[in-house]
């Protein structure tokens, strides 16, 4: 089975490639991006290439690209959450500052949520944001997540403690909100 590609009306979510490193660096050297999500500003193209190899190359991580361009504008993906003991997916995302306010992230997240619930058979998906990241909170609310709890967490890359708010969305809650398919899976 090949890599999963998700398509929406405006976006193609595809696997990251090492040749995306210069573009990733251009997006992630911005101090408004990484620290808001809990990671450091990228300092070089080589560092971005290593992030692609070690973090973004997972099977459930996608580069967000516009339909008319191969260049990534951000990223969306799933990891195992720390919100609960049993393994459940947690949705994460970011987008470059030049693409803020265009609803690309909610659109990408909706495609990943549909994939989670209809193709992977997940029962619940988590999402979280640091308390001072209001943009992320708005994305989470647009996608229908419900608040669950807030806790203090140590953010290792930034060497600081932050308050993190956790949200969850069950497959039943998601079904109430969605009746049509907004993406296609390519393999």
Regions found by a protein language model. Give the residues of each.
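Acyl-donor (CoA/ACP) binding surface of acyl/acetyltransferases
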Residues: 1-36, 61-187
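Conserved GNAT-fold acetyl-CoA-binding loop/helix
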Residues: 32-53
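A short helix-loop-beta-strand connector motif used in the catalytic cores of GNAT acetyltransferases and
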Residues: 52-63
């Amino acid at each position: 089975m090949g890599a999963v590609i998700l398509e929406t009306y405006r976006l193609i979510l595809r696997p990251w490639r090492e040749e995306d490193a210069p573009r990733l660096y251009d997006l992630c050297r911005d101090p408004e991006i990484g620290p808001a999500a809990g990671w450091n500003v990228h300092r070089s193209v080589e560092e971005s290439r290593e992030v692609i190899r070690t973090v973004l190359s997972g099977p459930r991580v996608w580069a967000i690209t516009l339909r008319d361009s191969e260049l990534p504008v951000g990223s969306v993906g799933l990891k195992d959450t720390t919100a609960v003991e049993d393994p459940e997916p947690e949705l994460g995302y970011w987008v470059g500052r030049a693409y803020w306010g265009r609803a690309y992230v909610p659109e990408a997240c909706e495609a990943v949520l549909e994939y989670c619930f209809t193709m992977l058979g997940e029962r619940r998906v988590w999402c979280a944001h640091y308390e001072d990241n209001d943009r992320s909170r708005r994305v989470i609310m647009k996608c229908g997540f419900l608040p669950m709890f807030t806790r203090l967490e140590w953010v290792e890359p930034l060497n600081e403690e932050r308050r993190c708010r956790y949200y969850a969305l069950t497959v039943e809650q998601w079904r109430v909100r969605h009746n049509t398919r907004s993406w296609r899976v390519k393999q």
